[in-house]
Amino acid sequence: MTISPNKKIYFASDQHFGAPTPEASFPREQKFVAWLEEVKKDAECIFLLGDLFDFWFEYKTVVPRGFVRVLGKLAEIRDSGIPIYFFVGNHDLWMDDYFEKELNIPVYHNNQEYEFNGKTFLIGHGDGKGPGDKGYKRMKKVFTSSFSKWIYRWLHPDIGVKLAQYLSVKNKLISGDADVKFLGEENEWLVLYAKRKLETKHFNYLIFGHRHLPMVLKVGENAQYINLGDWISYFTYGVFDGEKFELKEY
């Protein structure tokens, strides 16, 4: 795909709206909506790399309350003709077809490959990738099974959502505590995953979220691993102008 003149591709991840409470999250939602309003002026397309919400579950006739301004702005941008691509994270992994049917936004549960202006991209949320974290990988298989979703749907939404919110608040990574530190390239699972992917296929940019740490690291010849950070502590986003990728703060 060739990017139109004076257009850019934008990337953002890990907003975790709704955490630690809807009231505390609201200013961050307003800031994100303002960012969307700004970038739509020259956006070729927008990639959202997961955990937009701290919890999301789609019952057959019900979706979680709130996030009206965020959803409305996404709908407005999509209706204007600007493509938006959504990758589920570990907090919104139960996303089904609501975004596709109501917002016309495709939803991806796995990494995707793209080429823009001759540059190759590998894009995804990043959870469960690389060595280690075997407990989470096992848990993800259980949570994403059709049986688990069927069981959860039997919980009344008031109970199911409250339970999920309680568990999320207990996770320090999600609550935004300042204990997320760079572990070194040899210990960062997503960095190791990126390097392993490059052994079989070259990408110029391997872009992920999940880690909550803004990072741009060289992982090979003309290859960069990029972590988009988050909208809890850093308010960072990525932009590709057709020639180079930059990580910026809003």
Enumerate the language-model features and the residues they cover.
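Core catalytic region of metal-dependent phosphoesterases/phosphodiesterases
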Residues: 2-8, 12, 17-116, 233
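Structural motif
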Residues: 116-117, 241
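Short, surface-exposed linear patches
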Residues: 31-35, 68-71, 108-110, 130, ...
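Active-site-proximal loop/helix segment associated with metal-binding centers of metalloenzymes
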Residues: 126-189
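Conserved beta-sheet core of the metallophosphoesterase superfamily
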Residues: 106-109, 122, 127, 133-139, ...
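N-terminal short leaders/motifs
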Residues: 54-77, 176-203
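Nucleotide donor/acceptor-binding cores
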Residues: 7, 119, 223
